[in-house]
């Protein structure tokens, strides 16, 4: 911000790396873990666990906790890491040249950094499925006791004897069932023949009812068409009334009367206005009245 920015005084604490809590042996956590058999530098959990071979040196390290200070959802990644230093690649290249690294080594390092940047950009631009390791599900070995094996053998012997008895009983039951089936088959055939006859009768009855309904509808439709035709013929046969007209005055008055009859007659308070407009139309269509209006002698 420069000299105009507010001055902030920061004081470096005695424990900048925050490691005193991990090294202290007087805390509650250290005491309770040591009481349960844990020693500094050893792993957490049972020593003879099924996944004990998978432990590495990183398993004994501290667990890093990152505080979530954004509004993104769980699992979402920001476009850029806020803690990432800018220009670190160029600074590393400069330090490499000062330390005497060759140009080939520097080019290889730069290529690796570029590949990492491209991979990050592709993962951010085109989201892909990420598989997170959830640990190992290892089952402990179960050793069978000899007593259980002897009990199982005795149970198996009892079951074989019971199965032999059941097989004899099943054979006798099967013979009885066969006899019953022969008698039941004959009765079922009779019932099926009766049901088929009933079904055929019902289908015939339904078809007959549908046909009667259809005939009734056709008759009604024909009657309606005949009535419409008769009404149209009667309307066409009635002669239209004609009036005899003499001279130009009678022709103009007849035309105006026909037009006025075809127009829609207003209702209510508009009757007076409609009459006035009709009178104007008649006066304009009559030559004599126009001459009187304009005071012209014919």
Curated annotation (Swiss-Prot):
Its main location: nucleus. GO terms for cellular component: nucleolus. Residues 1-23, 145-274 are annotated as: Disordered. It is found in: Nucleus, Nucleolus. The keyword Nucleus applies. InterPro entries: G_patch_dom (IPR000467), PINX1 (IPR050656). It comes from the Eukaryota. Residues 1-11, 199-222 have a biased composition (Basic residues). Residues 25-79 form the G-patch domain. Transmembrane segments: none annotated. Residues 151-164, 247-256 have a biased composition (Polar residues). One of its GO terms (molecular function) is nucleic acid binding. Keywords: Nucleus, Ribosome biogenesis, rRNA processing. The keyword rRNA processing applies. PROSITE patterns: G_PATCH. One of its GO terms (biological process) is rRNA processing. Belongs to the PINX1 family. Involved in rRNA-processing at A0, A1 and A2 sites and negatively regulates telomerase. This is Protein pxr1. It comes from Aspergillus terreus (strain NIH 2624 / FGSC A1156).
